[in-house]
């Protein structure tokens, strides 16, 4: 049996694309193992799927000054030795890396063991982890056509992003039932990313009366961000994080407010959900979400509201405009030729399996 080790972590965006590949890889006869960080969000997600998980040490990679920048390289080095030992023992035929700081030691260790590595970059420009890992990769899959020029060497392959099959098979009635909505108001789904978004949470709750006058709200607010004072608010349902329920909640929603991570916006495109994107500002990111959002806005798939312009009036104005013009966005998304990347990526994995 062929064996693959997958890696990726830090946020759900570095894990869920791996899960999208799992059913197809199993169908192709691959035994699947996973290397991730000790305490990252990926551990719970992967172990829930029944996949054997190997934790390693991993230091965070930063583009800014921090005292931990002096100690974290040693954690990365430790992670390389741990990953090298795991890879030598498990003898995988190939490694698939989805990015995030934990992947750097795994990719280096695979290279040292002469194991081919396929990486995937979701955003238009590569994150720091993938930048560091690219020299050790066999091929780098990219989601956006604009990304090819940002990958050094002749390694980039335009594959699209892998989307979980089950996400496309949600049940609208089950989603509505889960939320307990009784009227026929349109449903607004708010997603702040797997770690939540304080900025989005605060402005939504501040404008709750205005929004609830037109919409029922499903609010995925992130771990430890529930507001107990709103538990019994009619038309408002909040979740820290959802997994199995997400397809039903997506299917039930009419509009979506979201950050602009590449994975989630391609899921919204696949589901043809009119969306308002609020990308992370450059103050708190490298600007990748701004580029992602601009690309989708240019294609007519999304309406964008910059975080710096996020105010009560601008939020309501954009939300009302999106709802009034929702069919325009649905039609634009229906014309998209972007493939689900699962088939393209698994074909590449097959090609380079030792």
Swiss-Prot record:
Q: Which SUPFAM superfamilies match?
A: UDP-Glycosyltransferase/glycogen phosphorylase
Q: Keywords in alphabetical order, please.
A: Cell cycle, Cell division, Cell membrane, Cell shape, Cell wall biogenesis/degradation, Glycosyltransferase, Membrane, Peptidoglycan synthesis, Transferase
Q: Which Pfam families match?
A: Glyco_tran_28_C (PF04101), Glyco_transf_28 (PF03033)
Pathway assigned in UniProt: Cell wall biogenesis; peptidoglycan biosynthesis
Which GO molecular function annotations are given, in alphabetical order?
Answer: UDP-N-acetyl-D-glucosamine:N-acetylmuramoyl-L-alanyl-D-glutamyl-meso-2,6-diaminopimelyl-D-alanyl-D-alanine-diphosphoundecaprenol 4-beta-N-acetylglucosaminlytransferase activity; undecaprenyldiphospho-muramoylpentapeptide beta-N-acetylglucosaminyltransferase activity
- Write out the GO cellular component annotations: plasma membrane
Please give the catalytic activity noted in the UniProt record.
di-trans,octa-cis-undecaprenyl diphospho-N-acetyl-alpha-D-muramoyl-L-alanyl-D-glutamyl-meso-2,6-diaminopimeloyl-D-alanyl-D-alanine + UDP-N-acetyl-alpha-D-glucosamine = di-trans,octa-cis-undecaprenyl diphospho-[N-acetyl-alpha-D-glucosaminyl-(1->4)]-N-acetyl-alpha-D-muramoyl-L-alanyl-D-glutamyl-meso-2,6-diaminopimeloyl-D-alanyl-D-alanine + UDP + H(+)
Q: Where in the cell is it found?
A: Cell membrane
- For the ligand (UDP-N-acetyl-alpha-D-glucosamine), the binding residues are 11-13, 164, 194, 289
Matches recorded under Gene3D superfamilies: Glycogen Phosphorylase B
- Per UniProt, what is the membrane topology? Peripheral membrane protein
Task: Please tell me whether the keyword Membrane is annotated for this protein.
Answer: yes
GO biological process terms, semicolon-separated? carbohydrate metabolic process; cell division; cell wall organization; lipid glycosylation; peptidoglycan biosynthetic process; regulation of cell shape
EC number(s) for this protein? Answer: 2.4.1.227
Q: Which NCBIfam families match?
A: murG (TIGR01133), PRK12446.1 (NF009102)
Protein function:
Cell wall formation. Catalyzes the transfer of a GlcNAc subunit on undecaprenyl-pyrophosphoryl-MurNAc-pentapeptide (lipid intermediate I) to form undecaprenyl-pyrophosphoryl-MurNAc-(pentapeptide)GlcNAc (lipid intermediate II).
The identity of this protein, by name, is UDP-N-acetylglucosamine--N-acetylmuramyl-(pentapeptide) pyrophosphoryl-undecaprenol N-acetylglucosamine transferase
Q: What is the lineage of its organism?
A: Bacteria, Bacillati, Bacillota, Clostridia, Eubacteriales
């Amino acid at each position: 049996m062929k064996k693959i080790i997958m890696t990726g972590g830090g946020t759900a965006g570095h894990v869920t694309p791996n899960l999208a590949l799992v059913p197809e890889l199993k169908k192709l006869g691959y035994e699947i193992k996973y290397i991730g960080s000790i305490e990252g969000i990926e551990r719970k997600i992967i172990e829930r799927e029944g996949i054997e998980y190997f934790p390693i040490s991993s230091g965070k990679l930063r583009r800014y000054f921090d005292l931990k920048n002096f100690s974290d390289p040693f954690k990365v080095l430790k992670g390389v030795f741990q990953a090298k030992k795991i890879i030598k023992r498990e003898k995988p035929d190939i490694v698939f890396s989805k990015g995030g700081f934990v992947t750097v030691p795994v990719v280096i260790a695979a290279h040292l063991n002469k194991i081919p590595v396929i990486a995937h970059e979701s955003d238009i420009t590569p994150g720091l982890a993938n930048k560091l890992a690219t020299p050790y990769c066999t091929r780098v899959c990219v989601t956006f056509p604009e990304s090819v020029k940002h990958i050094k060497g002749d390694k980039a392959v335009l594959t699209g992003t892998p989307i979980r099959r089950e996400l496309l098979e949600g049940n609208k009635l089950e989603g509505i039932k889960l939320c307990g909505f009784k009227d026929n108001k349109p449903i607004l789904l708010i997603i702040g990313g797997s770690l939540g978004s304080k900025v989005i949470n605060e402005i939504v709750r501040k404008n709750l009366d205005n929004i609830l006058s037109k919409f029922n709200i499903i609010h995925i607010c992130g771990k430890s961000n529930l507001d107990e004072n709103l538990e019994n608010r009619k038309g408002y349902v909040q979740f820290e994080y959802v997994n199995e329920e997400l397809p039903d909640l997506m299917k039930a929603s009419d509009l979506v407010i979201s950050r602009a991570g590449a994975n989630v916006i391609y899921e919204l495109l696949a589901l043809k959900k009119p969306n308002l994107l609020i990308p992370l500002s450059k103050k708190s990111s490298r600007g990748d979400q701004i580029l992602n959002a601009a690309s989708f806005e240019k294609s007519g798939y999304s309406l964008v509201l910059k975080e710096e312009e996020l105010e009560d009036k601008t939020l309501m104005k954009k939300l009302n405009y999106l709802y009034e013009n929702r069919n325009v966005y649905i039609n634009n998304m229906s014309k998209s030729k972007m493939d689900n990347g699962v088939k393209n990526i698994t074909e590449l994995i097959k090609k380079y399996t030792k």
